């Protein structure tokens, strides 16, 4: 379990201020029953230190047995140092209300794991591969997976579609579509 301080901001005052802003914004979103979704939080990776990373999965309410839906997978921003999957809960709830499976990914960040963007990218690849291998469990179409993200998360989404494009790299993590919000690219 994480606290706001663990995942949002490196100092207590900043964490409390950011949490207040986010929770006030969430109140407006959650006021409508159409956008109220409780994600299923599923572990997709266990790290060497025993910590685990999770996918926050939002499923449409009107899914029928055996039906496959397209998915959109979000990666939060924060300079690979800070951030939380909560950043894209509003977007995930919106897409779930429109019939898509929406996922917000937890990945390693520098503040908690002393990691680099390279480890974050490995986590992003593992998240997509995990979703594809468990597609039937969540009724998602493994051939219709979009990725999205802002800033550092946009970098991860862009990298999933471009890095390792030669034939020696398995394409299980390659998205079918990328939606990039102000990505860090050169």
Label each PLM-derived region with a short phrase.
Residues 1-33:
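Catalytic His-Asp segment of secreted/periplasmic serine-dependent ester chemistry enzymes
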Residues 13-17, 21-24, 90, 94-97, ...:
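Extracytoplasmic/secreted proteins, especially bacterial periplasmic and envelope-associated proteins
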Residues 34-67:
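N-terminal cap/lid segment of alpha/beta-hydrolase-fold proteins
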Residues 61, 78, 101, 106-113, ...:
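Short beta-to-alpha linker loops that shape the active-site pocket of alpha/beta-hydrolase fold enzymes
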Residues 67-78:
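Short beta-strand element of the alpha/beta-hydrolase
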Residues 71, 99-106, 146:
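A fold-wide structural signal in alpha/beta-hydrolase
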Residues 84-85, 91, 103-142:
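Catalytic nucleophile-loop/oxyanion-hole region of alpha/beta-hydrolase
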Residues 126-186:
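Primarily recognizes the serine-hydrolase "nucleophile elbow" in alpha/beta-hydrolase
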């Amino acid at each position: 379990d994480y606290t706001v301080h663990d995942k949002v901001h490196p100092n207590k005052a900043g964490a409390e201020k950011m949490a207040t802003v986010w929770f006030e914004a969430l109140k407006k979103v959650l006021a409508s029953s159409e956008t109220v979704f409780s994600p299923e939080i599923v572990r997709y990776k266990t790290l060497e230190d025993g910590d685990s990373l999770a996918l926050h999965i939002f499923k449409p309410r009107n899914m029928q047995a055996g039906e496959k839906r397209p998915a959109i997978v979000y990666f939060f921003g924060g300079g690979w140092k800070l951030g939380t999957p909560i950043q894209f809960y509003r977007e995930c709830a919106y897409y779930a209300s429109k019939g898509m499976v929406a996922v917000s990914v937890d990945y390693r960040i520098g503040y908690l794991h002393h990691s680099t963007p390279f480890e974050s990218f490995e986590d992003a690849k593992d998240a997509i591969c995990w979703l594809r291998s468990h597609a039937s469990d969540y009724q998602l179409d493994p051939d219709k997976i979009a990725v999205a993200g802002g800033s550092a998360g946009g970098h991860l989404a862009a990298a999933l579609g471009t890095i390792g494009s030669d034939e020696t790299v398995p394409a299980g993590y390659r998205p079918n579509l990328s939606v990039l919000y102000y990505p860090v690219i050169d």
